[in-house]
Regions:
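SAM-dependent nucleic-acid methyltransferase catalytic core
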Residues: 1-30, 203
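Conserved phosphate-coordination/catalytic loops
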Residues: 8-11, 54-65, 163-171
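Glycine/Thr-rich phosphate-binding loops of Rossmann-like dinucleotide-binding domains
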Residues: 17, 38, 91
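SAM-dependent methyltransferase catalytic-core segment centered on the flexible catalytic loop
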Residues: 21-79, 204
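Conserved Class I SAM-dependent methyltransferase catalytic core
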Residues: 57-114
Length: 216
């Protein structure tokens, strides 16, 4: 297993996952860096925040599938992958990403970002967190908190968005870590961005292993 836990690694996420042993991770977060709806709709004016996203290392669909296959391998049985997707991928479907894995979609949380984005018709104000579980599928003993709603309203501070345009809601992440892991468990984030998951793990007494590779 890769030994550098609780640090901000800058290696390739696949390299990190490949260094981990089978069934060694208690929880994984994954925010694939795809342009998704931006590429599909060809927006002419993306704005400063979306320009920031465009300089991040982008992942092809085949790369995302490879990540998820590795995540399936390293997750312990009945443990969870928290998979971030946008509206485009929610509508188009991501089920093929899970083919050839032991993973199944078991739930969905909508994140209301409390700030309007782009859109030719409706303006985009939400992202979606697919809750994916490794077989065998079961809720009892794997999900401790039962006050988590399927809609989360949480705004990211503007100064954080300028530095990390793909930042995710820390309070929601912290609640999910608390619900799905125990003290001392190992949480993985192979595309860690601002490393907010690391911050949550430190506050909750969990161990973290993750990396963020940005374009030069």
């Amino acid at each position: 297993m890769f030994k550098k836990i609780n640090t901000k690694l800058t290696i390739d996420g696949l390299e990190l996952l490949q260094s981990l042993g089978d069934c060694s991770i208690d929880l994984c977060f994954f925010d694939p860096q795809y342009r998704g709806v931006l590429d599909k709709m060809h927006y002419g004016n993306e704005g400063e925040r979306q320009k920031g996203r465009s300089v991040l290392v982008q992942m092809s669909e085949s790369t995302i599938i490879y990540f998820i296959q590795e995540i399936s391998r390293v997750l312990k049985p009945s443990r969870y992958l928290m998979l971030w997707i946008d509206k485009f991928h929610l509508c188009e479907g991501v089920r093929p990403w899970l083919d050839s894995t032991s993973l199944e979609i078991v739930d969905l949380i909508t994140w209301d970002k409390m700030k309007m984005g782009m859109g030719y018709r409706t303006r985009k104000q939400s992202e979606y967190l697919l809750i994916v579980q490794k077989k065998p599928i079961k809720a009892k003993g794997t999900w401790k908190l039962h006050n988590i709603r399927d809609v989360c309203s949480e705004k990211i501070p503007q100064n954080e968005l300028k530095t990390h345009p793909h930042s995710k809601p820390k309070t929601l992440q912290k609640t999910l870590i608390e619900s799905c892991t125990n003290i001392g468990d190992l949480v993985c984030d192979p595309a860690a961005g601002s490393f907010s998951v690391l911050e949550c793990c430190k506050e909750l007494g969990r161990n973290f292993i993750g990396t963020n590779l940005e374009s030069s």
